Amino acid sequence: PLIFEQLLAVSVGFVDTFMVSIAGEAAVSGVALVDNISNLLIQILSALATGGAVVCSQYLGSRNINMSKKSAGQLIFIMSTLSSLLMVISLIGNHGIINFIFGKIEKDVFESASIYFYITAISYPFLGVYNAGAALFRSIGNSKISMNTSLIMNIINICGNALFIFVFDMGVAGVALATLISRIISAIIIIGLMSVSYTHLTLPT
């Protein structure tokens, strides 16, 4: 499940690149460029979340449920704060970041990349929360929950892409919006599951 989940995590951008091809080469190139940034951020957030979840796992191993709940809440807070900071930096430095990483690129490719980067950057806080929740579930050996949530995220993304591209003809903005919506929903699902009383990861109130 863990390997499959990791594949699903990075497949969102791949699907976006594939489905936006109808909008032209510039759209494909722009989305593909930003997808490189997104994949790097996903790996960083996943690694940080996994490290934080180890603490919660240790408390669970020692049967200290209260501290495990507290550490889970702290991890969610830290990840949401960090990813929100990344969002702000990405929104403010949109053009500068693209220019710095990729150098001089064609105007139409740059515009597509900027649009996709701007909209998907809004999803970073939700991506951070999802990664935190997924890591916490994996830490107690319940990787199926995070895998299934990731699968749902991908299904929503594919359906959203189809709707926004083929029905509303939104191009790059459409695939970015579908990605944003899918990550919001996945974060809501993972937090909801964590809050259910039958898990040991109920968020502290």
Regions found by a protein language model. Give the residues of each.
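Helix-loop interface residues and adjacent transmembrane-helix termini in multi-pass membrane transporters
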Residues: 11, 22-25, 139-140, 167-169
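Hydrophobic faces of transmembrane alpha-helices in multi-pass small-molecule transporters and flippases
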Residues: 2-7, 117, 121, 144-151, ...
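Short alpha-helical transmembrane segments in multi-pass integral membrane proteins
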Residues: 56-123, 167-201
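Small-residue-rich hydrophobic transmembrane alpha-helices
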Residues: 28-88, 127-146
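Hydrophobic transmembrane alpha-helices of multi-pass small-molecule transporters
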Residues: 40-43, 157-158, 187-191
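N-terminal transmembrane alpha-helices
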Residues: 1-18, 22-23, 39-51, 83-87, ...
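Alpha-helical transmembrane segments of multi-pass membrane transporters/permeases
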Residues: 79, 136-162, 173, 177-180
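Interfacial/gating helices of multi-pass transporter permease domains
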Residues: 19-39, 107-112, 172-173
